[in-house]
Amino acid sequence: MRYWQFVLFIITMFLSTSCNKKCENKVVTVSIDTLSLHDGDLIFREGRSTESQVVTSLDSGSYSHVGIMLHTKDGWRVIHAVPNETENDLDTVKYESISSFIQPDKCIKAKVIRVSSNKKITKGAIKYALQKVGMPFDKDFDITDTTTFYCTELVWRAYKHVGIDISKGRRHHINLLGFNKTCILPSDIMPNETNCTLSNKSAHPKTYI
């Protein structure tokens, strides 16, 4: 079963819950303490899209999307793989400003996680992610396919490429109506949320590997 067939099933299954949750989410501005950011930090967000509702319904955590950050002369940028974000957007690996990544119509809350590594490793992970910008979004959620990427797969592969498994082997096994996949979801690459400070107004880095 293709990605969008699966999404339509989940939408039907969770429609009432998703709509109620979405209505309850107030539009707030999420701020990031950019002075404390490092290259290679992972930024998680809970989004407002239907796809985000699907992910949080299937996952054990409260975040639906993730990207890897890089500081440039134009400010902080995020490399991330995202589907169907705007009506005219292609479903690809994107490279955009952090302000766009956390703008209120996309983001309910955000959290930044730091991967413990040296500058050489971080540089290698970022280089890998940058090389994938423009490549297609993985609509089949096939972790064995290195020509397409979904968000958690991209950041996982970026660090795996330089020798760090940020998932520590954790996976979600999804088997619903012919959609039978082993996937990496946001909670698989995130520390236990009870050990982290969460806020819908700001995000501060936490070291976990």
Where are the predicted features?
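Cysteine-nucleophile amide-bond enzymes
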Residues: 19-209
